[in-house]
């Protein structure tokens, strides 16, 4: 996801973040940052800041259900931090809340764009922050929910103060790249931007035309590449690299999490929770979820067909890079080359790619959030009522520390040798698609419907 990702693999963690107590100690340390988040010059106390709940977790962990129940209990509204749920028509693959759920609890930043449009982390910051203010002004509780790590990081810490390009620069950058994009000549476009002054353009995800164009806009506006602008999160992270000596035991392990300047300088009192499960159980749940998304006539394949009928190609923009949609679009294109014919073997190969990509995405999400110091990890396999009560108590409390009951804590790492062994030998076990004939209805749909264009019908439905 983003899914096409927005979450990417972070290889270096700057601090061991798994203390024995899992107590978040709030301490003051003066520092300054170039940050678009309003900082509190008067250093407001915790009780004086408005509270915002953040719930994240890997795909399939149950964070949406948790947020829904929490919103009912706290008179809250949900802000989606999902890079795919912003798109109209992409319902099944993004696991959007149902219409009935959205009538019970107001949801924000869902169904706000057409799949052909780009949506950036900077746009999410602006939209998410505005939604937060509106919810608080109504006297309700903002609950930000999603697994797109970069969205949540910018939402909390702020976005880089990069000058906004003029309309002339935007038009110039567009004109310089549009020919390459029309001809699907990604490599030549990257070479142009690298030669213009941004060597890191070569490491962008393939066909991420939005970010490539944005890089060129910044170069044209400032003469510097995007990487030269300081990111607010990095300013906070610097404070974590050199913690006080008393934060470590004699063996070098962390005895506590020192969030020195973060909570003091952020403009809201963020209560952050990461919901996860033992890895093997999570992977099994993800595999079953992928199967569910392919069952029935209105699943991911139907939505992928619509994207193709709009003239979009897999991996060509944020919507078509999303996990599930990209694989389904590639599979349908393959079927269309053979006039709608597909063998069970080809279907199961597609299903395996979908499941593998989803599990790998969950793994990257956990790697990302393992290095995010603000989050309390909760075990999703525990009773929902217990988890709800834990978060509710944390919200209502005015204490300077948030403590997670031992029974609800989730380890950030695989520490059990048995679990490590099971992960090493993990194999998908389907519950719907097991035998060759189990996919016959899907293959029949592809033959009869999968190669027909229904873009106009869907267009009118989501208008």
UniProtKB/Swiss-Prot annotation:
The lineage of its organism: Eukaryota, Viridiplantae, Streptophyta, Embryophyta, Tracheophyta. Gene3D superfamilies: 1.10.20.140, P-loop containing nucleotide triphosphate hydrolases. ATP binds at residues 57-64. GO terms for cellular component: cytoplasm. Its cofactor is Mg(2+). Keywords: ATP-binding, Cytokinin biosynthesis, Cytoplasm, Magnesium, Nucleotide-binding, Transferase, tRNA processing. Belongs to the IPP transferase family. This is tRNA dimethylallyltransferase 9. Its EC number is 2.5.1.75.
């Amino acid at each position: 996801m983003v899914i096409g990702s927005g979450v990417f693999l972070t290889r270096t963690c700057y601090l061991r973040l798994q203390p024995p107590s899992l107590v978040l100690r709030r301490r003051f340390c003066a520092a300054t940052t170039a940050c678009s988040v309003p900082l509190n010059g008067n250093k407001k106390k915790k009780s004086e800041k408005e509270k915002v709940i953040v719930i994240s977790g890997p795909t399939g962990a149950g964070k949406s259900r948790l947020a829904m129940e929490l919103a009912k209990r706290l008179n809250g509204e949900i802000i989606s931090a999902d890079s795919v749920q912003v798109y109209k028509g992409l319902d099944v693959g993004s696991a959007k809340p149902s219409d009935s759920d959205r009538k019970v609890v107001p949801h924000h930043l869902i169904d706000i764009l057409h799949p052909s449009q780009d949506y950036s982390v900077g746009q999410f910051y602006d939209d998410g922050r505005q939604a937060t203010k509106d919810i608080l002004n109504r006297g309700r509780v903002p609950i930000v929910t999603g697994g797109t790590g970069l969205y949540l990081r910018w939402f909390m810490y702020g976005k880089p103060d990069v000058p906004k390009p003029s309309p002339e620069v935007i038009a110039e950058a567009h004109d310089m790249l549009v020919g390459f994009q029309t001809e699907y000549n990604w490599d030549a476009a990257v070479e142009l931007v690298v030669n213009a002054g941004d060597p890191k353009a070569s490491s962008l995800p393939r066909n991420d035309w939005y970010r490539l164009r944005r890089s060129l806009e910044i170069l044209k506006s400032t003469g510097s590449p995007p990487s030269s602008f300081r990111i607010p999160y990095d300013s906070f992270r610097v404070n974590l690299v050199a913690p006080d000596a008393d934060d470590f035991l004699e063996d070098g392990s962390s005895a506590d999490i020192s969030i020195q300047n973060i909570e003091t300088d952020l403009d809201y009192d963020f209560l952050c929770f990461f919901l996860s499960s033992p890895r093997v159980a999570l992977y099994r749940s993800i595999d079953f979820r992928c199967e569910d998304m392919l069952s029935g006539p209105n699943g991911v394949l139907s939505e992928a067909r619509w994207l193709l009928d709009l003239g979009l190609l897999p991996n060509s923009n944020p919507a078509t890079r999303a996990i599930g949609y990209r694989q389904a679009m590639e599979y349908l294109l393959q079927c269309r080359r053979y006039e709608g014919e597909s063998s069970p073997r080809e279907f199961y190969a597609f299903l395996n790619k979908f499941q593998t990509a989803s599990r790998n995405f969950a793994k990257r999400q956990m790697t990302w959030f393992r290095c995010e110091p603000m989050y309390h990890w909760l075990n999703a396999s525990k009773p929902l009522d217990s988890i709800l009560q834990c978060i509710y108590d944390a919200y209502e409390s005015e204490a300077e520390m948030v403590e997670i009951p031992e029974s609800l804590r989730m380890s950030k790492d695989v520490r059990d040798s048995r679990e490590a062994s099971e992960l090493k030998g993990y194999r998908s076990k389907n519950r719907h698609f097991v035998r060759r004939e189990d996919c016959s209805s899907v293959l029949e749909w592809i033959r009869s419907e999968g190669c027909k264009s229904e873009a106009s019908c869907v267009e009118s439905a989501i208008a």
